């Protein structure tokens, strides 16, 4: 009697396939997206953000931790010498051991190579690679020339990926003492320089915080917030005047630690971090402020009002500077000294 040939996955009844896909973990479901039935099945809902961990300081790559499953996933890729600069969902902006930038999907083999750093277009700045780990950054105008030799490890970045629209924006900058930023959009063959308020006079005034939300870039520099629209076909547009937001009009001291956060609706929040002054269990470990929607025209010091709740549907990812729907509503996720604190309620 002949043994019947086993059915392949694609030959199983559609109802059975849907039942199988509904039982898969998030990572297994993602690997099964080649099947047409999986695309008709809602992916597993996650209640908590995944964590990317770097054992041995990243020497042997990274692992992904899913709090919902209490499970660690090890990447099959070799990430030796790779520096992870930023992420947007499962897409990561990384720099390899030769200071090349690219974007990868950590759940697949998808990779997008970015132009070399030397492709920067700017009237005042140049960037040059000096060996595998050293860079040369130079700023100049008609009167002065300034240059630095930063290490590759000083490069920082932020990333925004819209998988539905198949669009992405990557921004990179130096960690310390530089008001310099550059960005790249899909299909460009170079990086474009983003001009901040000062070119040379305050060239060593560092960026205090930066958030990328869609094609809008929010930059905290000195005592103001600059807002850049990167959606243009060529270059960008400074729309700061449409969003006046002075950081000195809040109830914090000179040395206070604050973060910029942009909500799903595009509203800018200031988050005052009191964790270095108060116990982490304190109800006021964080204080959140927004621009007063009804300011007193006769006063100049009441432009910010405190926010008591993020709402029933939003959660704040403080490290990314954004809010999003779902997960654990009205909560803040953040990292502090490499220790992750989960579900800190603010109301």
Swiss-Prot record:
Question: Where in the numbering of this chain does the F-box domain appear?
Answer: 6-52
User: Can you tell which superkingdom this protein's organism belongs to?
Assistant: Eukaryota
Membrane-spanning segments:
none
PANTHER family for the chain: F-BOX FAMILY PROTEIN, OS07G0183000 PROTEIN-RELATED
Its recorded name reads F-box protein At2g14500
**What are the top taxonomic ranks of the organism?**
Eukaryota, Viridiplantae, Streptophyta, Embryophyta, Tracheophyta
